[in-house]
Amino acid sequence: MHLPAALTGALTLIARAPALWPGFAPQRTPLLTFDGTRTWLNHADPGEDGWTHVDGAWVWPGRHPSLSAHTAVTLPGGLGAAGVLLPDLSLPGDPDQAARTLAATLIHEAFHVYQGATPSPAWPAPELAALTYPAGAEVRHARAEETHWLRVALRAGAGDWTTPARHALHWRARRHAQLDAAHRTFETRMETTEGLALYVETRFLADHPDLDPDAAPLQTPRGWSYRSGAALAHLLDRTGTPWTGEVLAGHPLADLLTGQVGSPLPAAPHPDLEGAAQAAADAHDADLGARLAAFHAQPGPALHLSSPGGLRLGGFDPMNLHAVGPGTFLHARHVQVRGPDAELLTVGHSVLTRGPDLFSVQEVTLRGLPAPTAHGGRWQIRTPTLTVDLPGDAVQVTPDGWSVRLG
């Protein structure tokens, strides 16, 4: 039993890596790697039973339960480690390039371990704000323009990079004017959380982040913030200022860059990017429209539940949640809602909720329902995908099913 060749090469490269961020030492960060057969732990003692010591590393048979994605993980003994799943990595066929790719990925996740051990206002991001992040053509177009100018600035080398950087800041300001405070905070914090992890990864690779203006209109705000944050950090490096401490103090990367290169400088739009943004926004709207139409087209009776005083959102699946209109959300897989003497739980049955915001639910609609049962004054539906429990005297029969109004 020996370390996979790519991991052996990656550990050698990590040991030789230059300083990438003050106080960050991937050479001493515990690294957890699943090779498809067993899990390897390097740079630390696991602090739990079940591991075997082999060739200077620790081995767990199969995939360790703590490791389910490329991410920072915590082992049962409390050890924080950078986790990587080799089967999920598309490693190059060349052994040297495979080792380099794996090393860069481990360094990225190791930076998240560093972040977890380094308290800073730069890290927490209100990720739920991504669920309601504006998806219109103006926001998408400005993102594409900013991506274009960030790429020009990075490619300028020793030439004039500050002018395109200021153009990028102009389009950022245009975009941020369309966002509310929560959306702006989400973006700037994702840039310091995920963007800086990509920054240290690309510094290790002596490369820049992949910036594609044509793809930018289609990218999610979260996915784009990896690239924008890394790009801003690389540009800050060119200023020669000790900017990393300012980031740890909570200052957004773009604000720091503005302080170094000057105020945003207007730049004319690119018609092709404007058209691509409109097409992306139209496709997004069409997708939401199709999802909503499919929801309403479900055969069978419907239940309309309302409560002027509000219902409590107990849980939901953010990966299967769609904002289909102002204050209107389609929960495509799972949601739990509670109200006065009432409960609704779905796991595989879609639900439409309405209210002032995601968590302030005032109306709930379900369609495609089976026949309910009535017992002991309760009106109930119980299936493998759906639980509805309501006071029977509050349920009214309607032409399309039932309605309930709770106090």
Residue ranges and their predicted role:
Residues 117-179, 183-211, 229:
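Post-HExxH zinc-binding segment in Zn-dependent metallohydrolases
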Residues 1-61, 104, 331-333, 337-340:
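N-terminal mature-domain "stem" immediately C-terminal to a signal peptide or N-terminal signal-anchor/transmembrane
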